[in-house]
């Protein structure tokens, strides 16, 4: 089987990671003790992707939980599925990273990283044929962003040919925990551009808007936001966990989604949007799902896809539905909105259908878009970064951990390059291909 090793780092990563395991354990019929109580063979057919079968028919998540302070992991351990994880796979320090990327990446995190890599090796060795790694973390803090990116580069060194996939929670101005988020995020993106194959950008601002506008929650909590994240993560990984009519693994997804290696930042979406507690039992039609899924209000990143163009799109439909209808609807969307899809990648929308819907829904759809509009998100962080960096505000916290200003300048320009690469392909048309390629080559040099 093609296994995936899951790593969750930092407070945010551990919270959305724990939620993800709750949701998929439920979908696979696995209770908090790791025993199977399901009702369908499909639940077990590809269970090995995310779970290891231990003695006594117990299923143990291939999950590694990492943090620089014990707090969050204690709450995961005492949470609803806390006992399902392998106790040796909790790796934590005592010092904390204090929302400082340099502490996570160079000092505190660097001290802990070897013990994490030991666990990564142990998990990878128990795999039959490891396909890759997935990391859940945030980019605004210290541990998830600093140590998370350190782990990625170390794992990359050791497993260069395995896929590296991240679910990265991007900071947003409306939902800010820390004033140095733009620094931490820029330094992280600088790493992610080079070292990951697929990054799902999940944005707190977009999640708040969804909770507020669509779900009519007046005071959304992190629990509500994480509910949306886990629904999206469950949808995105459906093809990896269940047999479907169009099966996917991480590599196939990457091949379909990433036209240029640096442009691998995806905008996830989900339909139908339901709040916790009020899961709707009314079945949506395929046209409604398709329409909702492409709606800007359903995107989990605060970017408007109408401000850019889609390079590639993958859609995952779940539930019993007619493949023919799905294909018709997807073509319909492309024909009606053809100006929003680049014409120089002819069949750039892929659709997968999985028969098992998520809990409480008859059918659902998950959207993964590689859109040039994601540059809005990077621009937003970059502007905030520049505003502070121009005055060298807060820099002493980073230089005190041994960082150099040069690294900030490099990260800043790498992020700006990324924005202009997205812009370049947004403006590109099919006919000017000749001159366009030469430009590209100069850029590389």
UniProtKB/Swiss-Prot annotation:
PROSITE patterns: TUBULIN, TUBULIN_B_AUTOREG. It comes from Sus scrofa. GO terms for molecular function: GTP binding; GTPase activity; metal ion binding; structural constituent of cytoskeleton. SUPFAM superfamilies: Tubulin C-terminal domain-like, Tubulin nucleotide-binding domain-like. The modification Phosphothreonine is found at residues 285, 290. This is Tubulin beta chain. The modification N6-acetyllysine is found at residue 58. The modification N6-succinyllysine is found at residue 58. The lineage of its organism: Eukaryota, Metazoa, Chordata, Craniata, Vertebrata. GTP binds at residues 11, 69, 138, 142-144, 204, 226. Belongs to the tubulin family. A motif (MREI motif) lies at residues 1-4. The highly acidic C-terminal region may bind cations such as calcium. Keywords: Acetylation, Cytoplasm, Cytoskeleton, GTP-binding, Isopeptide bond, Magnesium, Metal-binding, Methylation, Microtubule, Nucleotide-binding, Phosphoprotein, Ubl conjugation. The MREI motif is common among all beta-tubulin isoforms and may be critical for tubulin autoregulation. Its main location: cytoplasm. One of its GO terms (cellular component) is cytoplasm. The keyword Cytoplasm applies. Tubulin is the major constituent of microtubules, a cylinder consisting of laterally associated linear protofilaments composed of alpha- and beta-tubulin heterodimers. Microtubules grow by the addition of GTP-tubulin dimers to the microtubule end, where a stabilizing cap forms. Below the cap, tubulin dimers are in GDP-bound state, owing to GTPase activity of alpha-tubulin. One of its GO terms (biological process) is microtubule cytoskeleton organization. There is a cross-link at residues 58, 324 (Glycyl lysine isopeptide (Lys-Gly) (interchain with G-Cter in ubiquitin)). The modification Omega-N-methylarginine is found at residue 318. Some glutamate residues at the C-terminus are polyglycylated, resulting in polyglycine chains on the gamma-carboxyl group. Glycylation is mainly limited to tubulin incorporated into axonemes (cilia and flagella) whereas glutamylation is prevalent in neuronal cells, centrioles, axonemes, and the mitotic spindle. Both modifications can coexist on the same protein on adjacent residues, and lowering polyglycylation levels increases polyglutamylation, and reciprocally. Cilia and flagella glycylation is required for their stability and maintenance. Flagella glycylation controls sperm motility. The modification 5-glutamyl polyglutamate is found at residue 438. Residues 429-445 have a biased composition (Acidic residues).
């Amino acid at each position: 089987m093609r296994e995936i090793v899951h790593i969750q780092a930092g407070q945010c990563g551990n919270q959305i990671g724990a939620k993800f395991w709750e949701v998929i354990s439920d979908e696979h019929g696995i209770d908090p003790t790791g025993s199977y109580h399901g009702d369908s063979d499909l639940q077990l057919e590809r269970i090995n992707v995310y779970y290891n079968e231990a003695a006594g028919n117990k299923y143990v998540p291939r999950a590694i939980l990492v943090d620089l302070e014990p707090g969050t992991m204690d709450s995961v351990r005492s949470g609803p599925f806390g006992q399902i994880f392998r106790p040796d796979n909790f790796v934590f320090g005592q010092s904390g990273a204090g929302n400082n990327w340099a502490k996570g990446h160079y000092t505190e995190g660097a001290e802990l990283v070897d013990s994490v890599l030991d666990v990564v090796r142990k998990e990878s060795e128990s795999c039959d044929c490891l396909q890759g790694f997935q990391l859940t973390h945030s980019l605004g803090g210290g541990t998830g962003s600093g140590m998370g990116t350190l782990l990625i580069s170390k794992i990359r060194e050791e497993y260069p040919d395995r896929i590296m996939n991240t679910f990265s929670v991007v900071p947003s101005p409306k939902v800010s925990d820390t004033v140095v988020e733009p620094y931490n995020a820029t330094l992280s993106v600088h790493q992610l551009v080079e070292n990951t194959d697929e990054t799902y950008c999940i944005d707190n601002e977009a999640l708040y808007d969804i909770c507020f506008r669509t779900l009519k929650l007046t005071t959304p909590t992190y629990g509500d936001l994480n509910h949306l994240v886990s629904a999206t993560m469950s949808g995105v990984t459906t093809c990896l966990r269940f047999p479907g009519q169009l099966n996917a693994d991480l590599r196939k997804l990457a091949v379909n989604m990433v036209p240029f290696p640096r442009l691998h930042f995806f905008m996830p979406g989900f339909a139908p949007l339901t709040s916790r507690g009020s899961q709707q039992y009314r079945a949506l039609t395929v046209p409604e799902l398709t329409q909702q899924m492409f709606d800007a209000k359903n995107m989990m990143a605060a970017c408007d896809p109408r401000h850019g163009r889609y390079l590639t799109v993958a859609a995952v439909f779940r539930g019993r539905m007619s493949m023919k209808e799905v294909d018709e609807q997807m073509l319909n969307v492309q024909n009606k909105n053809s100006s929003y899809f680049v014409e120089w990648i002819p069949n750039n929308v892929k659709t997968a259908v999985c028969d098992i819907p998520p809990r409480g829904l008859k059918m659902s759809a998950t959207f993964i878009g590689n859109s040039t509009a994601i540059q809005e998100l990077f621009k937003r962080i970059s502007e905030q970064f520049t505003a502070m960096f121009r005055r060298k505000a807060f820099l002493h916290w980073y230089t005190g951990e041994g960082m150099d200003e040069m690294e900030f300048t490099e990260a800043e320009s790498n992020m700006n390059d990324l924005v202009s690469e997205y812009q370049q392909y947004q403006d590109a048309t099919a006919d000017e291909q000749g001159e366009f390629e030469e430009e590209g080559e100069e850029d590389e040099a």
